[in-house]
Amino acid sequence: LALVDPNFFSIFTLPLIEGDVKTALIQPHTIVITKATAKKYFGGEDAMGKTLAFDHNMASYKVTGVIDDIPSNSHFHFDMFASMTGWEPAKSDSWMGGNFYTYLLLKPGTDYAKMEARFPAMVEKYMGPQIQKEMGLSLSQFRTKGNSLGFALQPLTSIHLHSATNNEFEPGG
């Protein structure tokens, strides 16, 4: 299960077999599932409009879309994509949580190095004050203690075979 932004399917080309890519995840407690998941939970019945309930105090989710199963050469293999709209942790303006993966669509010809060169200033501006507030340390003190913070860009096409970053969904290669 992946909690995703309503724009997820406008970034990733996972066409919906059923449902509308533009509206499937706009409402809270909506979910798009794979064909295999639809068959697993609903047999031969149409999954659209049905409800999936989860443990661990998560709400029930209404099926608003069905996609083909994720290809084997993808860097993620989730079988359910639930809307994070209305999900309380997603409303936080804290930059301290590392629990989100962010994908960017860049214009053709974008200079990756120039864009990455702006990231340290973002860390200083947005994370520095939060580290000070939450930990009582300046950003430099935080780093002196062996911690690191930063962002890097990686082309989506290189993740499956070549990624060696920490906390990937699956090992590269």
Which residues does each predicted region cover?
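Mid-to-C-terminal secondary-structure elements
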Residues: 2-18, 29-172
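Glycine-rich loop motifs involved in handling phospho/adenylate chemistry
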Residues: 22-26
